[in-house]
Amino acid sequence: MPSFDIVSEVKMNEVLNAVDNANRELATRFDFRGVEASFELNKEEVKLEADADFQLKQMVEILRAALLKRNIENSSMDVGDSVHSGKRFHLNVKFKQGIEKEIAKKLVKLIKDSKIKVQVAIQGDEVRVTGKKRDDLQEAMALVRGAELGQPMQFQNFRD
């Protein structure tokens, strides 16, 4: 029986490239001349550091633009609150990896309510969709692409 997996992953090497591009843009921007500001990637989060809170907001927008250029959706970002320590401001941006239980349940309910003839099963941090016809699976894919679930979804292991 044909099947595929729905996953939510962020490629960290693309995030690294986006952070490097954002740091390069910071170095060339006129409004950041003479300001100590930087992006730093630590495992699964990006640390933003600047002299003022408004600069952090600008840096988040720079990071969003760099991520979009690398085909990473903004909905995969969790932007934390800015923290003031000494004369510096810090902000952490985390990336959503895997599908959380609540979102997986919403996904299963969405597909089952649509009356498409497929079976849906939650398998850890991914969702497996199985059906008799390839057309039913493609219809389920289109349904998931159109749904706003708060994080980007990718499709893997499409088997006939």
From Swiss-Prot:
It comes from the Bacteria. Signal peptide: none annotated. Belongs to the YajQ family. Nucleotide-binding protein. Keywords: Nucleotide-binding. One of its GO terms (cellular component) is cytosol. GO terms for molecular function: nucleotide binding. HAMAP family: YajQ (MF_00632). It comes from Aeromonas salmonicida (strain A449). The keyword Nucleotide-binding applies. The keyword RNA-binding does not apply. Gene3D superfamilies: 3.30.70.860, YajQ-like, domain 2. This is Nucleotide-binding protein ASA_3207. InterPro entries: DUF520, UPF0234-like_C, UPF0234_N, YajQ-like_sf.
